[in-house]
């Protein structure tokens, strides 16, 4: 008996057979589910299908709104049916979503495509992390969670770098290839989700716990909104993060192809450019420690946001090669800014506040602003005013960050910041219940597991 137990469950620090299976299947699911072959060419593809700029960016605005609306109910669905079933449902929806443009390359087909993607992503965004966390905890291997999450992201980025340059040549062979391959990848993620083992010892009873968790969610949501209203420091950190997220999302997704086409960079090269941008962002994300500690995190986020704005404005002045270089510089600055802003946001959350709910609110606010920005982007591009859009975006960022800095220096947020950090200094870190610092993993079983936070 003892020998059997020893072979089934190795000593501390070693992975069990089930833990290895969970990690490997999670790698496969995350890589295949997020491998969207059409990403470098979707704008040009929709233009060739006869959609106007207003229609294309209108669909993007609807996508952001839909993602916000799906965010809350899909969390409750995950509680009711369980994370493993939620991953399976999301993979089925994503497979169907990627086939919609193949079945109907029209406004309706692309609208259904993006609405289904919003639903599929909402179903899986928190469930994948929650399943991995609970699976490793059930096997007493939870110390491997952070490495497993990081490796999954790295593999996903590597797959995009390898696959995206192939999109142009593949489209020359079969025009719908990017969408068919995306559907095949999503189907592969479904196979991984079906193969995921049932978690033992997690205490999950989704059906019976749903009511209790739904009530807890409503209480946390109310508490989170009151926390934002009563904490000027937290609200300012959120607003500053909006500049980073909106600029990066709009440029790297919505404006990426119009900018390249405007400067004469052919559609066949878009995949290679996006792959280079992905590498630049990955390097920045992996090396935030390169930023000097002489400046506070707030100052660094502001500086990087201004760098993003300046890069956008500079794109109106350069030629094709300069624009490609500026896009890579933009991606690198985004990579540096994201982890700094994420830690800044975590540090700004009071110790007794519902952290996961507040972070979800931040995500919803970011996407709501993107929805409004996408409408404006569509109007500018449709009118042929791309350069004006880039300059106005840069100026709006400067004005927003200037207002944030004035409020910070005026002392409006000082009292709230002091109450959160305990000393008001940048080195202080708020503690979770139980004394765990906010930038360290929460102990297993606490309310701050990564169940609903997006990467």
State the predicted function of each range.
Residues 180-211, 406-418:
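Helix-loop junctions on the cytosolic side of multi-pass membrane transporters
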Residues 115-157:
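Cytoplasmic helix-loop-helix junction between adjacent transmembrane helices
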Residues 11-69, 231-275:
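Helix-loop boundary and gating motifs at the non-cytosolic
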Residues 67-105:
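Conserved MFS/SLC helix-loop-helix module at the cytosolic interface between two early adjacent transmembrane helices
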Residues 92-106, 306-319:
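C-terminal ends and interior cores of transmembrane alpha-helices
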Residues 2-20, 198-239:
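Juxtamembrane intracellular "pre-TM" segments in multi-pass secondary transporters
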Residues 108-117, 322-329:
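Paired small-residue
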Residues 59-60, 68-72, 79, 84-85, ...:
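C-terminal transmembrane bundle of multi-pass solute transporters/carriers
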